[in-house]
Amino acid sequence: MSRRRQATRRPVQKDAKFNNTLVSRLVNTVMVSGKKSTAQRIVYGAFNRIAEKNPAANPLDILQRAVDNAKPRLEVKARRVGGATYQVPVEVTTDRQFALALRWLVDFADARKGTPMRDALATEIMEAYQGQGNAISKRDEVHKMAQANKAFAHFRW
């Protein structure tokens, strides 16, 4: 692997149906084993469920608010200093905030057994939109860990 320079990030293509990069990133997060059409069917089905539950609201706006609510601002990273490992709180970059929020939404939707994935994803997005649900509790847990380890913030690198 070459060490000359860092690889450039390729921009995410906009979604064909909604013309939105956030939807495209959600589809890519849902995708398993390269089955993109299945992932698109799941995400579009979830949007249909959201539209059925809230006919007045736009599903894209609901998704945007849900992701904004689930985004972590701080997280902890392990840092080894003098034989001891400290959990050092660090700020999360914008790109990683989106990635973590989407991953948490999809993972917790996948963990809801007994319901189709599109319904579980729609429920998880709606709960995050309302400021509750598993993704929000995960964000709060990460923030709580960062707050508890605030004393080690000077080990930041």
Model-derived features: positions:
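Strongly charged
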Residues: 2-33, 37, 45-157
